[in-house]
């Protein structure tokens, strides 16, 4: 499909000053619960992205994670979240790294450094960080890994290196932390919904829930139940997002995992996707030549 055809389905997801709602999503790049919300966010943006702007706020816990007595508990928690959500996150990463996942601050700072190259760039960098950690078991608190992710995200690498150690990124992260403190956010993920056309306080939703919960809140904030936008053809969806989980496809298209497997096998046979197996669930990588810098359906 051409870039124009992709935009027919995804243009409404991008930011626009006249959208009636803003959603602040507080995330920690190392948080598996945040990762587990990816299918929900994709479906919400595709169906109703014309009504809201999504703003990602870094809300990393600054508690040290490298205490040996905690590793087995963290690993167990990851395994449970993966089993429940269908979004793979391998708890073995806590035992297999030469260096511990010790600095959530560094991962959050890297996200803000990437965001200095544009919000789309930041969104795609965050997604790539999550894939690197939860699927590939890479240490995203290690600077060399972060540089590799930046390169894979097609960022200006020299600019990213400079920004990673700049006061600009630090101030941007401090700004996010201030927002989290002002909104009394203590749980990741947290979504806060604001109606930009009213002065009412926002509606804060700590934790992760099913898609239906967020859709209902969206309707409540809009005061209406609008018709959803057309869902793109599956091949278009894969081309646009490049690397997606079976769980994401299942939720967006209201399919069972068995039905997803059947449909994706057809695309794999046509050499349009490659299957990527993970510890929990399956992922699919687009093999198309379509390239649109920072495909993330953002803003």
Curated annotation (Swiss-Prot):
The histidine-rich N terminus is essential for interaction with Spx. Belongs to the SpxH family. Irreversible aggregation upon several stress conditions prevents interaction with Spx and therefore leads to Spx stabilization. Inhibited by interaction with SpxO/YuzO. Keywords: Cytoplasm, Metal-binding, Zinc. Adapter protein required for efficient degradation of Spx by ClpXP under non-stress conditions. Interaction with Spx stabilizes Spx and exposes the C-terminus of Spx for recognition and proteolysis by ClpXP. Is specific for Spx and does not enhance proteolysis by ClpCP protease. Probably binds 2 zinc ions. This is ClpXP adapter protein SpxH. Pfam families: Thioredoxin_5. It is found in: Cytoplasm. GO terms for molecular function: metal ion binding. InterPro entries: Adapter_SpxH, Thioredoxin-like_sf. Gene3D superfamilies: Glutaredoxin, putative protein disulfide isomerase domain. Induction: Expressed throughout cell growth. Negatively influences its own expression. Disruption phenotype: Strains lacking this gene show poor growth, affected sporulation, complete loss of competence development and overproduce Spx under unperturbed growth. Mutants also overproduce TrxA and show reduced sensitivity to disulfide stress. GO terms for cellular component: cytoplasm.
């Amino acid at each position: 499909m051409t870039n124009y055809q992709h935009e027919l389905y995804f243009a409404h997801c991008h930011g626009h000053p006249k959208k009636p709602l803003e959603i602040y999503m507080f995330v920690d790049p190392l948080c598996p619960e945040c990762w587990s919300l990816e299918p929900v966010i994709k479906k919400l943006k595709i169906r109703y992205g014309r009504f809201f702007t999504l703003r990602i706020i870094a809300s990393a816990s600054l508690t040290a994670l490298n205490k040996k007595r905690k590793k087995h508990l963290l690993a167990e928690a990851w395994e449970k979240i993966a089993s429940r959500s269908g979004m793979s996150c391998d708890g073995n990463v806590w035992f297999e790294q030469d260096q511990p996942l010790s600095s959530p601050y560094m991962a959050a700072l890297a996200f803000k450094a990437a965001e200095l190259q544009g919000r789309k760039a930041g969104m795609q960098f965050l997604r790539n960080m999550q894939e690197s950690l939860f699927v590939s078991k890479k240490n995203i608190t290690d600077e060399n890994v972060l540089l590799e992710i930046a390169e894979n995200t097609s960022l200006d690498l020299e600019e990213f290196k400079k920004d990673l150690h700049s006061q600009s990124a630090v101030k941007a992260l401090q700004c996010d932390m201030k927002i989290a403190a002002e909104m009394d956010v203590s749980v990741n993920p947290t979504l806060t919904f604001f109606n930009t056309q009213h002065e009412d306080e926002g509606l804060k939703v700590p934790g992760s829930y099913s898609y239906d919960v967020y859709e209902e809140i969206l309707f409540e904030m809009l005061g209406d139940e609008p018709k959803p936008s057309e869902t793109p053809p599956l091949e278009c969806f894969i081309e646009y997002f490049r690397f997606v989980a079976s769980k994401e496809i299942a939720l967006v298209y209201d399919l069972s995992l068995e039905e997803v497997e059947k449909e994706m096998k057809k695309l794999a046979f046509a050499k349009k996707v490659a299957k990527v197996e993970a510890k929990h669930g399956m992922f699919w990588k687009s093999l198309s030549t379509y390239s649109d810098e920072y495909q993330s359906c953002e803003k």
